[in-house]
Amino acid sequence: MSESDRLFAQPQQRVADFVFNEDVVRVFPDMIKRSVPGYPTIVENIGVLGAQFAQPNSVLYDLGCSLGAVTQSLRRHVRNDGCRVIGVDNSHAMIERCSEYLHAQDAMYQELLPVELIEADILALDLQPTSLVAMNFTLQFVAPDQRLGLLRRIRQALLPGGALILSEKLRFADAQEHALLTDLHIAFKRANGYSELEIAQKRSALENVMLPDTFEEHRERLLAAGFSRVSQWFQCLNFASMIALP
């Protein structure tokens, strides 16, 4: 069971860049629930939507799988014969805890898809032919100049009829819209018990690590990577999820 997120509750003389280490892993489920509006809806529906694109005897990828929430959702919803999920994350602590969570899921459910967990940098990963790739709040942590190359490799690996489901925090080209949705997101975090100090220090920790794009930038990049259609299927405040088709 996860702990309550208090990582930024005490004043820090110097706020270090955010990393997905053991401290974050311990509180991650609580952190994500209290920080990302709509997160449970996104995760559950990646499984629902993913089942529409998953093909028999194919690989499904969860790139940047963290604790495996999307992997678990895919295992619950996809029923195609011969499918398996590959979860990939570069954090050793995340992969270890994810494995524990998946073993717990195996104890509760029968006939779930098999899973392989890989500790690796997704930028260096050799992708197998795949009918579905999920990246749930992962691309925003990839260096901007490496995002197009990664998406091109994903597009090349996708089977005909497959899909990429991409969830990201958004920024907005219109300054007033960006300010409004940023303020509303801060209000969401306040309502979930975060103090002004916690909000400010976490923002400082993330500002050089997580670099969001606008939806228009995502769409243009996905089209440049070879995708034919990009549709946004969900948005709550400044968090969104989209489907890109080959």
From Swiss-Prot:
User: What SUPFAM superfamilies would the database entry show?
Assistant: S-adenosyl-L-methionine-dependent methyltransferases (SSF53335)
Which InterPro entries did the record assign? CmoA, Methyltransf_25, SAM-dependent_MTases_sf
Q: Note one Pfam family from the annotation.
A: Methyltransf_25
Question: Which protein is depicted?
Answer: Carboxy-S-adenosyl-L-methionine synthase
**What is any one GO biological process for this UniProt entry?**
tRNA wobble uridine modification
Specify the species.
Pseudomonas aeruginosa (strain ATCC 15692 / DSM 22644 / CIP 104116 / JCM 14847 / LMG 12228 / 1C / PRS 101 / PAO1)
Q: Where does S-adenosyl-L-methionine bind?
A: 39, 64-66, 89-90, 121-122, 136, 203
**GO molecular function per UniProt:** carboxyl- or carbamoyltransferase activity; S-adenosyl-L-methionine binding
Q: What is its EC number?
A: 2.1.3.-
- PANTHER family (UniProt xref): CARBOXY-S-ADENOSYL-L-METHIONINE SYNTHASE, TRANS-ACONITATE 2-METHYLTRANSFERASE-RELATED
Assembly mode: Homodimer.
Top-rank taxon, per record:
Bacteria
Q: What residue intervals traverse the membrane?
A: none
Q: What class of enzyme is it?
A: transferase
Q: Which NCBIfam families match?
A: carboxy-S-adenosyl-L-methionine synthase CmoA, PRK15451.1
Instruction: Spell out the reaction equation it catalyses.
Output: prephenate + S-adenosyl-L-methionine = carboxy-S-adenosyl-L-methionine + 3-phenylpyruvate + H2O
Family of the protein in this entry: Belongs to the class I-like SAM-binding methyltransferase superfamily. Cx-SAM synthase family.
The UniProt function text for this chain reads:
Catalyzes the conversion of S-adenosyl-L-methionine (SAM) to carboxy-S-adenosyl-L-methionine (Cx-SAM).
Give the record's keywords alphabetically. S-adenosyl-L-methionine, Transferase
